[in-house]
Design a protein with these regions (language model features):
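Catalytic cores of RNA-modifying enzymes
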Residues: 1-161, 165-166, 212-215, 223-226
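An accessory alpha-helical subdomain
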Residues: 135, 139-141, 148-189, 197, ...
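Short acidic (Asp/Glu) and glycine-rich catalytic loops that position anionic groups and cofactors
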Residues: 192
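Short, amphipathic C-terminal "tail helix"
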Residues: 196-226
Length: 226
């Protein structure tokens, strides 16, 4: 069990707390005093192998989404997480297309796996009580590490960065149609190839539709270069 804690006084006290309340876990517990956004397989070598690991965390609410997406990108073997975040963040992470709160975090997380809100935690369990409610999000990664829709027939995988670039562009102007939001980068024939109506808005697309659009766009670009 490895704890990543940014605050030095807290990191210093953790081993003592574990020794007091979970003495049998002392030998398998270690603390890494650093910012969770800076961890990677090089500075956390315990997690470098292929063994799947689980993340359990009470995440700082303002950086919860970047931490989760960064860790999923860096650690292919992060298989499951159960995290406590602000209720609004939990709703955004687990939302489905078509909702006002469905956005970049929801659709990017769906590239990696499935997320659901599994519990709400009232503010009265904290002291002092915060002015927000909290919730738990349970995430399970797809066996291949990404949505099966990204697997191409030839065994290759649609490029994640390309998919995420489309997502960022579509949600950067979420009130606009896909045609208007993406016209500088995606030719109209790509929509046709992907079977996606360009008059739709980005907030109505599933991750698999973004993948289909990215695949069609990459094929169109290839043809242009030949």
């Amino acid at each position: 069990m490895t704890a990543v804690e940014i605050d030095p006084p807290v990191a210093e006290r953790l081993p003592g707390t574990i020794a007091e309340f979970m003495p049998d876990a002392v030998d398998r517990f270690r603390v890494v005093n650093r910012d969770a956004l800076t961890v990677n397989p090089e500075n956390l070598p315990d997690f470098k192998d292929d063994d799947s690991f689980t993340l359990v965390a009470n995440l700082p609410y303002n950086v919860a989404t970047p931490i989760l997406l960064t860790l999923l990108e860096r650690f292919d073997n992060l298989g499951t997480f159960l995290v406590m975040v602000q209720k609004e963040v939990a709703d955004r992470l687990s939302e489905k297309p078509g909702s006002k709160i469905y956005g970049t975090p929801s659709v990017k997380l769906a590239w990696y796996g499935t997320a659901e809100r599994v519990g709400v935690i009232g503010r009265n369990v904290f002291w002092p009580a915060p002015n927000v409610d909290s919730a738990l999000v349970l995430f399970k990664r797809y066996p291949g590490g990404h949505t099966p829709a990204a697997d191409n027939a030839d065994g290759s995988v649609v490029d994640r960065e390309t998919v995420f670039r489309l997502i960022d562009a579509a949600f950067g102007q979420r009130r606009k149609t896909l045609h208007a939001a993406l016209k500088k980068i995606v030719p109209s024939e790509a929509f046709e190839k992907a079977g996606i109506d360009p008059t739709r808005r980005g907030e109505t697309l599933t991750i698999d539709e973004f993948v289909a659009l990215a695949r069609a766009w990459m094929r169109c670009s290839r043809h242009e270069h030949h």
